[in-house]
């Protein structure tokens, strides 16, 4: 009670956020997990079974006298009641059939492979480019403010708008094919970047890199500015070459920031949705997120729930890894 009297205002202010988290995050996730274990065919089999029992018992009853007919009708009613109780049971239709179906579905296996490929390729490209830009912006340069504004511009553009912009670049009649044609690197037939395979994966990686690069640049700039000037001065006194200084001094001190950036980007990359949906669609280059959406639009709700549950589990692994690293780095300073 003393705690409530002391912090009643803080608790009152937390209630809206707590209600939002429970109502719009926790409950949907738990409902999705529950639905992923329900066999969608159970309800159909139940209806068919009830219908067959009714037909059989009715036909048999007509073959006997009224007294025996009443006995069969009683058995029929008891059977229907037992089936109704079975359907109302919380364990009715519970099985792993949706997960078995997913891991035998070639489209879902391709979706996992495409998601992993986009994540790994995107992380590698974004790490190199973001670090290079951060190193450039951390130095005194003329027009650095303008260049920083240009670099950070994609951060304020909605993802759907970014995807629409990218369609003007990667369309068969887009700017990229036009440039390749002018350079003599492309014949009369334009490249269909959305045809699937590695072309579509590279297209999504490039679009995603352009969209999220500012966030990684900001993280790396913060890490570079956190390095004490005395460290740089000591390496300059030693006469270390710039590359040697980067790999032996700057990069080790940037390790916590790089780790956090990679984990956060991995979480975001696994749940990427709008860019691949608009650029590549769901048929040629399925990802886990777009596969989940596609199955939902086909009214395969339980299969979609199972796919979403798998995606949630993967993301939670990255989240717990992130929290573990944060706590581990905090302990020496405690």
Predicted regions and their residues:
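A structural signal for multi-pass alpha-helical bundles of membrane permease subunits
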Residues: 2-92, 96-334
